Amino acid sequence: MAQALPWLLLWMGSGVLPAHGSQPGIRLPLRSGLGGAPLGLRLPRETDEESEEPGRRGSFVEMVDNLRGKSGQGYYVEMTLGSPPQTLNILVDTGSSNFAVGAAPHPFLHRYYQRQLSSTYRDLRKGVYVPYTQGKWEGELGTDLVSIPHGPNVTVRANIAAITESDKFFINGSNWEGILGLAYAEIARPDDSLEPFFDSLVKQTHVPNLFSLQLCGAGFPLNQSEALASVGGSMIIGGIDHSLYMGSLWYTPIRREWYYEVIIVRVEINGQDLKMDCKEYNYDKSIVDSGTTNLRLPKKVFEAAVKSIKAASSTEKFPDGFWLGEQLVCWQAGTTPWNIFPVISLYLMGEVTNQSFRITILPQQYLRPVEDVATSQDDCYKFAISQSSTGTVMGAVIMEGFYVVFDRARKRIGFAVSACHVHDEFRTAAVEGPFVTPDMEDCGYNIPQTDESTLMTIAYVMAAICALFMLPLCLMVCQWRCLRCLRHQHDDFADDISLLK
């Protein structure tokens, strides 16, 4: 998952409380989209919606509200494995490609996959090891029959990594026992020959090659007895559900089929452009990853964004640890000053040449509510934007504002305003466009690739240079050896003469 699972850092400080989890809150009727200064010329919308194939759009009642989770600990769906079926909760992760489940006792697991009890399990006699920035897991590969009770009415034979050992992978109290990697085969472990679950699903059934996610997040409940309420959402497999979003869907191309990589062309804080080379936003990639909690930004972009957010919210002072995600800030219940925090706009490459669209993110998304703090009279939050060394990661806190369509068949990702996102009476999340943005292709970061033929050429050149320098040296050594030999022979002859005397 871009690839690290979310972990909560616990710190103490003056007037600052340690972070633990989340408390939900106000959900008001959605108003019109957020206004703001357009980027360049704003063009008319060509069509309200693009035509879709039959079966791609419609109502998927059986799949609505099939996700559960806890704030900062991921969203999971119920799945069954084996014969007879064993039910497990599986984390939905668009930032990895392995379907992996706990298959041995673990202190944080209430249940696990028992391969020996399944008559349909097949052992592939192959191991797999997956390290993360923090944590790792390893296990054994096999296949078994898999279905999703609140999903399409199909059963598929899928590759399963049975996790036998792990470190800092499972989360205590998260209520999930495995991970469903929904990205492409290129990043599957141990290699890209291992077919991911969604590829198997599409190949073995008539399910269309797309899925969509509505992650609803958590605000604060009016009833404090609901403070431990789970987050929820929907994973629509094989289609798009109209009831889960408002307005139009806007699509950005999938740049490369490994992670769900996209191109960000501009970033604004409260309408003010960060004015950075757009390559910086995508260094070394930008991905959409439901398995990561935060919006993660490359170092330079993170520093510029935090500087702008600090300036916009300067009416209140916050400790440095807050901006690093290590400390919480709290206000008396119901008094959070949302208005002092700016909105963040990410402009994404559009499908039409030189056109982009923007998604606008509210502070209710990037300030993540946490639960179980020392005093229940306060609303406490963690700053959910963090620094990344592996590019931009649009994690769950971003996705919670939008209905996101992973249209694998057309190599594109769609965004629309989610019908369940948390907001206030003054501002809502927004998806707006099109905007004129030239030379967007230049914004993508190209990882330097050196093939074997290039390496061989370099090796030959280096060998030739070495030979060129070594040749005179070799000649000098040979000449020295010859002279030494002649001198040695002369000395031997002189010694013989002296003996004869």
From Swiss-Prot:
It is an enzyme of class 3 (hydrolase). Glycans are attached at residues 153, 172, 223, 354. SUPFAM superfamilies: Acid proteases. The chain crosses the membrane at residues 458-478. A motif (DXXLL) lies at residues 496-500. Keywords: Acetylation, Aspartyl protease, Cell membrane, Cell projection, Cytoplasmic vesicle, Disulfide bond, Endoplasmic reticulum, Endosome, Glycoprotein, Golgi apparatus, Hydrolase, Isopeptide bond, Lipoprotein, Lysosome, Membrane, Palmitate, Phosphoprotein, Protease, Signal, Transmembrane, Transmembrane helix, Ubl conjugation, Zymogen. It is a single-pass type I membrane protein. Residues 22-45 form a propeptide. The active site is at 93, 289. Its EC number is 3.4.23.46. The modification Phosphoserine is found at residue 498. Residues 22-457 are extracellular. CDD domains: beta_secretase_like (cd05473). Disulfide bonds join 216-420, 278-443, 330-380. A lipid is attached at residues 474, 478, 482, 485 (S-palmitoyl cysteine). Monomer. Interacts (via DXXLL motif) with GGA1, GGA2 and GGA3 (via their VHS domain); the interaction highly increases when BACE1 is phosphorylated at Ser-498. Interacts with RTN1; RTN2; RTN3 and RTN4; the interaction leads to inhibition of amyloid precursor protein processing. Interacts with SNX6. Interacts with PCSK9. Interacts with NAT8 and NAT8B. Interacts with BIN1. Interacts (via extracellular domain) with ADAM10 (via extracellular domain). Interacts with SORL1; this interaction may affect binding with APP and hence reduce APP cleavage. Interacts with NRDC AND NRG1. Belongs to the peptidase A1 family. Responsible for the proteolytic processing of the amyloid precursor protein (APP). Cleaves at the N-terminus of the A-beta peptide sequence, between residues 671 and 672 of APP, leads to the generation and extracellular release of beta-cleaved soluble APP, and a corresponding cell-associated C-terminal fragment which is later released by gamma-secretase. Cleaves CHL1. This is Beta-secretase 1. It comes from Bos taurus (Bovine). The lineage of its organism: Eukaryota, Metazoa, Chordata, Craniata, Vertebrata.
